[in-house]
A protein has these predicted regions:
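Hydrophobic/aromatic-rich alpha-helical bundle segments in the mid-to-C-terminal region
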Residues: 69, 112-117, 132-179
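Solvent-exposed, amphipathic alpha-helical segments
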Residues: 3-11, 57, 61-64, 102, ...
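Amphipathic alpha-helical packing segments from all-alpha helical-bundle domains
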Residues: 55-56, 60, 90-100, 108-134, ...
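Helix-turn-helix
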Residues: 6-45
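Residue cluster at the C-terminal edge of the helix-turn-helix DNA-binding motif
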Residues: 10, 24, 35, 53, ...
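Residues in soluble alpha-helical coiled-coils and helical-bundle/repeat scaffolds
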Residues: 34-41, 66-67, 107, 111, ...
Length: 179
């Protein structure tokens, strides 16, 4: 599954094919077709594996965060790490773009909707805990607003070909959370 998830992250849904996954994993083609009868099953497994890996990373990060008030920029960085993944230097904008391409492309794959709802619920729970531990608790409605704000900021930055969509999202989220 790691090979499939890596292909998904690197190139989106179009790169996920039984043959490509088998080649990446160094396995014969029959090994992927044995476990996944259809491409949809392979895609769903890759999305779930990647989503769970990201949630595990987020939980590990949260475990390292002491429950204490923190400055606004630290809170914003923690939230963005959960929503956009950790900063990736020169590849950050590209990885953020690929992340949003995957999110939008799931809309054309109805079989992924239940999984995406489940992963989204878990992510929102993680974000609520990040904010609460940081001294900035929010209710469900406010959390949805913050997520929508980040999503909108990132999409607008990507459309404008802004070289740093994370910085745009950081600025807007910071302004929204400022007392």
């Amino acid at each position: 599954m790691e090979a499939a998830a890596a292909l998904l992250v690197e190139g989106g849904f179009e790169t996920l094919r039984h043959r490509a996954v088998a080649e990446r994993a160094g396995l014969p083609l029959a090994s992927t077709t044995y476990y996944f009868d259809s491409l949809d099953e392979l895609i769903a497994a890759a999305v779930e594996h990647h989503g769970r890996t990201e949630l595990d990373r987020g939980r590990a990060q949260l475990a390292e965060v002491p429950a204490e008030p923190r400055d606004l920029d630290s809170v914003v960085d923690l939230v963005l790490d959960q929503l956009l993944g950790p900063p990736a230097g020169k590849r950050d904008a590209e990885l953020v773009l690929l992340r949003y391409e995957r999110l939008v492309a799931t809309g054309r794959r109805p079989y992924l909707r239940p999984l995406m709802r489940t992963l989204g619920d878990e992510l929102r729970g993680l974000l609520r805990e990040v904010l609460a531990r940081s001294g900035s608790p929010v209710d469900d409605r406010r959390l949805e607003q913050l997520i929508a704000l980040v999503d909108g900021a990132v999409v607008n930055a990507l459309i404008a070909v802004d070289p740093d969509p994370r910085a745009v999202a950081h600025r807007m989220l910071r302004e929204s959370l400022q007392p």
